[in-house]
Amino acid sequence: MTRAPINLDRRGFLKVSGLTVGGLALANLVAACGGEASVDGERNLTLRMPFLQDMQVPDPDIMYEGEGVQVMSACYEGLVNYKSGTSEIVPGLAESWTLSDDQLTYTFKLVPDVTFHDGTPADAAAWIKSFERRAAINEGPAYMVTGIAKSEAPDPTTLVVTLKEPNNAFLHYAACPWQMFAVSPTAVETNAVGDDLAQEWLKTNDAGTGPYVMKEFVPGSHYTLERFDDYWGEEPYFQSVRIDIVPEIATQKLQLDQGAFDLVAKGFAIPDVLNYRENPKFNTITTPGATVMVLWMNFNAGIFTDKALRQAMMTALDRSAIVETAFQGLTSVQTDYWPENMFPEGLAPFDPPIDIGPLEAIVPTLPSKTIDLAWVTSNGAPAQQVAELIQTQLAPTGMEITVRAMPSAEWFDLCNQPAEQRPDLLVATMGGDALHLDTAMRIFLRTGAKPLNAYQYGNPEVDRLMDEAITKPTDDEANQVYLQITDIVQDEALWVPLCRTPQNMVTQANIDGIEQDSYIPYVFRPNKITRV
């Protein structure tokens, strides 16, 4: 059975590691996970699923990758969230909020009588301590609080946050998967070793308010979450969640097919997804992600320093044919320059007519026709096929294209390499941290940004416009500035947009209530999912 896709965005820059699990080891693993979901009542109240690899440490102020968001969203909560399927910001631990006329002061009205898992009140004073911890830990998500000038708690349910300067992305920071979480100050103080702010303790424990408590965290083996009986919100259906670390997707598939797993959230090859769609024992949910697959051009070295050549590339490809062939109908060609949930659909269209003529006219004049085309392996077999289809489509022009795989670690290090050592062309993805265009631009276009500004683009005017846009009081005003940036980068022809990358979740047919995260659609709301 196939569910209709939700129009979401998604981000993901994750590396997938592998271990071969064979023979007896595989049989033992399947046996350990149990058989059909109907074995007994207790099994019916345990949700079982795999991760491809260990998540980063489950510290709410350190964890900054994709798959682990499932654990964090079960144990911790933020002030606000994205409404599933949209970029609309809705209440979380803050039931309402206001913004001052000068765009500097947010006043959050907190849900009353919420407690952390250790019984400490999750009040405004606790939120101030949470902000302070994130700043002090100073890991990847810390930038979300660096713009805070001061936080105040005039009463337990009122949190006043004053920014150093206007920032219209602030609520998006608070809603994104790596949002500012409420962290129990009692747990931090009690379990701190020296000045580590309980970092060691939080490697295997939690200090949140979420619907689940971390019961076991065994790296390389499994994580177990148990329902928090004093949860303030909607009680979860499942008493516990068991997440097993299973590095091979083939092993995950076998266990799903045998009923040992209730769902596999990501990672299946497209042929497997299509087969599951035809199998009534399973539900498949295909959702466009927040990342866009693009063809980057090396504008700082080699033949693609020629702007006219890059502009000719923008129209030379039959993008629809490439996307349809590589993704077999699971996503569609990108007709906007930016992901639709990150920037209003139709406001920055990109749908040029196919015209290979300008490229055919330029290629004979090039000093070299040898092209190095790489594709990032974390994007799987479809990315390889996209690269090979580009190679085939451009061959008649006389370009001599060699296709090669590039591991994610190498992609992340391109920014540190000399321009001439970067590939001429690169099939990769781009996105941000939240459903706000500023987060993508600062990652991929900001002067000096690393690691994902792989070709080290830099333009002082683009930087200035970014800083202007984020201070605008309305979306319309900000979008007008973002259109100026779009005009600049489109004219410079830095990349060719191809498609939003689809995410495919497969569940047993008796699993219902999947409410996906708007940003990472392979993450679901843990207190909404049920067995029917």
Regions found by a protein language model. Name each.
Residues 83-84, 88, 177-236, 240:
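Gly/Pro-rich hinge or "lid" segments in bacterial periplasmic/extracellular proteins
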Residues 200, 228-274, 400:
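Ligand-site clamp/hinge motif
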Residues 328, 332-365, 377-385:
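Structural transition elements
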Residues 50-101, 132, 207-209:
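N-terminal lobe/hinge region of extracytoplasmic solute-binding protein
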Residues 109, 143-191:
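Surface-exposed binding/hinge segments that line
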Residues 505-532:
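Long beta-strand-rich cores associated with HINT superfamily self-processing modules
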Residues 402-412, 439-509, 532:
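Extracytoplasmic/peripheral linker and loop segments enriched in polar/acidic and small residues
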